[in-house]
UniProtKB/Swiss-Prot annotation:
Keywords: Glycoprotein, Membrane, Transmembrane, Transmembrane helix. Pfam families: TM140. The gene is TMEM140. This is Transmembrane protein 140. Residues 33-77, 136-150 are extracellular. Its main location: membrane. Expression significantly higher in gliomas than in normal brain tissues. GO terms for cellular component: membrane. Disulfide bonds: none annotated. Glycans are attached at N38. It is a multi-pass membrane protein. It is found in: Membrane. Residues 1-11, 99-114, 172-185 are cytoplasmic. The chain crosses the membrane at residues 12-32, 78-98, 115-135, 151-171.
Length: 185
């Protein structure tokens, strides 16, 4: 018969979940704000959620396109808007996750824990959907060898969100065993 696990393991698991959430937030801030949503940023090609610049052979410069030209190139306005909504909405929902996580840990509140899991699950779906939709429209200009740091940061954030959801699905069973509410903080 196995005895109860030491409290430090539960606290270490919780702290690792909080650290992963903070890393996901930092990766998404880097990709979407610092890199301005650019997934490919090369001297002859810049493609992102707000930039669509292709190399012009005639003038030998980078020419940025706006919406009437983008629709002619095959990038629909509604599709790009939905991709932006998904990716940037994912960042917003991820920003709301740490508070319910902390409240759930301090108060042993399973509803707050489920709320945080919900925020992260919807965030993961929005990020995957927005990134997938965007890539489906720009795939003819972007190749696997061309992704920039913004794309790698968003891909890493998506992988970490999935890892977080798996870890959080296992964690609530351990969180309920706290001896008292005051000791769990």
């Amino acid at each position: 018969m196995a005895g109860p696990r030491p409290r430090w393991r539960d606290q270490l698991l919780f702290m690792s979940i909080i650290v992963l959430v903070i890393v996901v937030i930092c990766l998404m801030f880097y990709a979407l704000l610092w890199e301005a949503g650019n997934l490919t940023d090369l001297p002859n090609l810049r493609i992102g959620f707000y930039n669509f610049c292709l190399w012009n052979e005639d003038t030998s410069t980078l020419q940025c396109h706006q919406f009437p030209e983008l629709e002619a190139l095959g990038v629909p306005r509604v599709g790009l808007g939905l991709a932006r909504l998904g990716v940037y909405g994912s960042l917003v929902l991820t920003l709301f996750a740490p508070q319910p996580l902390l409240l759930a840990q301090c108060n042993s509140d399973e509803r707050a824990w489920r709320l945080a899991v919900g925020f992260l699950a919807v965030s993961s779906v929005l990020l995957a959907g927005g990134l997938g939709l965007f890539l489906s429209y720009v795939w003819k200009w972007v190749r696997l060898s061309l992704p920039g740091p913004g794309f790698l940061a968003l891909g890493s954030a998506q992988a970490l969100l999935i890892l977080l959801l798996i870890a959080m699905a296992v964690f609530p069973l351990r969180a309920e065993r706290a001896e008292s509410k005051l000791e769990s903080c």
